[in-house]
Amino acid sequence: MTTDRTPSPLKVVLTDLNATVVESWRAAFADVPGIEIRHASLLTAKVDAWVSPTNSRGRMDGGTDAAIKRHLGAGIQLRVQKAIREQHAGSLPVGSAVCVPSGAVNPAFLIAAPTMRTSSQNVSETLNVALACAAAFQAVHRQNRLRPGSVRSVALVGLGAATGKVPPRVCANLMWSGYTLFNDHHFEDDDDLRATVLAQLDDLEKAPPTQRVRITPPARGGSAARRA
């Protein structure tokens, strides 16, 4: 089920070394207050949680994942995989995420939100970016429900824009869709989140590159999406 919620005070930092991704974010999030956009490495972001666009097995062996593992130490992959085993029987579906202690001061937490099932998978023709982004923010909800106020800020890279081959503007628009869904609704379970996004598959897929789609939960007896 979904429940309406008031706008979150969560600080969101979008940060990437790819200048085209950064410019695409600036276009997609131009009218969104409270978003910090940086042309910089995720590893320099001073926040409570980093989002790692991992794969379903939690293997941190390439791209952003590998950089995070080098920075935080090999133990971070073990923590992520332990959480995946305990909470998802060893395979974390796209549209789900886990939040684990990082073992560091900055960030205190790492959120693993897969954009692909296996390493180096091309996800450019999927909605995996929207699913992963929305799932990452739902993980913030869950962590703050367990420990209120423990995640007040979060940093994300361009999900799927490197290894996943998602075009930067498409990536930015899908991340906008995932972020606005987080602000509008709190999902009680991941299946509900996935069903909500996938029910609006046509709207998201058919939107031109410069047009964003605001996802809304399915109405009783149907579904809806608004274009922005």
Locate predicted features:
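Macrodomain-like recognition of ADP-ribose-binding/processing modules
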Residues: 1-228
